[in-house]
Amino acid sequence: MGEYTAKDVAALRKETGAGMMDCKKALEETSGGLEEAKDWLRKKGLAGATKRAGRSADQGAIDVSVNGGVAALVELTAETDFVAKSEDFRGLVARLVAQVSANGDAGLAEQPFEGTTVGEYVTQAASRLGENVGIGRVVRYETTDGLVDSYKHIQNDRGVIGVLVELSGVDASNAAALEVAHDVVLHIASAAPRYTTRSDVPADAIERERAVLTELTRNEGKPEASIDKIVEARLNSFYKDYVLEEQGFVKDPKVTVGSLVSGLGGSAAIKRFARVKIGEE
């Protein structure tokens, strides 16, 4: 019997939606491994594919910016919601975004900043605010052959989701391209894709999904000769769930995000994206 805690059961229930007893059984059967327990539940048909919930983070705030061909995103973490939504804290993350936009993200902690360095300033802010404060995820895109856009979802007075996207093969002054880029960042915030294209999905992730779907299909009593075909069809559903280009556009699910962008003509394509949410890794 695997060793696990009540917290493990709660985490598994939260991520899979499975019942408490099923979660306990899954943890027992997999020696307490959370990822293995998720797969066990799915193979038994007791849970669907789940969005990666990730490690639970502290509180914090996110800010984003676009300045010409440069887009930047900074996550600043804190211990409490009270500090994270304070004017002092939100002002700091906004200034850090401007810093990253202007000076890049390399060696951020050592960069000169307001009479000291970024790292030292954040340490001073932690002392002033009375709790642990740190720089979380930092993303910066710079384009010369396309355009960038950003979106920040605000909740409780501070940014909790930040998105950046870069489109290549488009004119940054084209109104239609600008509109599509903004539609894409809004879509990413809502749909939480993991990958840009199918080729970006790691081989081990595909094999893990195929193994789970194969056993699930077999447990459903499907004819052995049909299993491979059924599994491949279900893998296509996996791609539609997690690959940005293949997701149905939130405003019109009959249209994929990839076709929305390619409809701009020429070599228009999604080059890359980033989505950061407070509380998720």
Predicted regions and their residues:
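N-terminal assembly/interaction segments in proteins that build large macromolecular machines
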Residues: 2-281
